[in-house]
Amino acid sequence: MEKKIILFHGSEKVIEHPVFGAGKKHNDFGLGFYCTESEALAKEWAVSSLRDGFANRYTLDTEYLRVLHLNGPDYTILNWIAVLIEHRLFSIKTPVARRAKQYLIDNFSVNVNAYDLITGYRADDSYFDYAESFLNNAISVEQLSQAMRLGKLGEQVVIKSQFAFSNLKFEGFSIAEKDKYYVQRKARNDEANQTYLKMLDDETDGIYMQDIMRGGIRSDDPRIPRNLSE
């Protein structure tokens, strides 16, 4: 990561002074200020079907920040999933899913609050549905890894600590038009869902959540995909 980076935050409003401690604690990586290095992605995340939005632009000095790269080679796809299910709210409908959630948190989760900055892929609702299917033993870890590559997941940069917030400087904003960016986001999501449904028809002898729990599989097992960028 460069010493000084440019970040964009998609929002329905202009945010000149992001506030430490504000936001939703049930986002992907918990409480924080969610950004991306892609202006186009920020614009997609800023709009809805009914309104335009804004891509707020910032610079961030990262020189002395503790940075967690969740999609780097030191972590598996299950580390990423464990962090998601530890923070996101969702209904658990089966005993298998309940045990699976706890197993992943106990054995694969990462303490994101020990870092100033986190980089990792953003899980839109469709992608979180894939994670739920994995928890319910409906798809294998190999299928999960393949599903998470569908639709070109965007990488988000999350500012976690007060120190990191103090290094963030507002530089301006640009308008995100819903007629362009909502259409782009929806098209990518629809394509990913269609490909996912086709993938489910393929036979697989992969590793399922039940296998992981019964076998006591941990992060260092070479059968678990290391990260989403591979």
Where is each model-derived feature located?
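Residue-level preference for alpha-helix termini and adjacent loops
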Residues: 14, 19, 28, 32, ...
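Ordered hydrophobic segments in well-structured contexts
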Residues: 5-9, 33-34, 55-57, 156-158
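Short, flexible loop/turn elements at secondary-structure junctions
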Residues: 12-13, 39, 62-64
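Compositionally biased, low-complexity linear motifs
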Residues: 44-60
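ADP-ribose/NAD+-binding catalytic cleft of ART/PARP-like enzymes
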Residues: 1-28, 56, 225-230
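Extended catalytic/binding region for NAD+/ADP-ribose chemistry, centered on the ART fold
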Residues: 24-49
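Conserved NAD+-utilizing ADP-ribose enzyme module
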Residues: 2-3, 49-51, 62-230
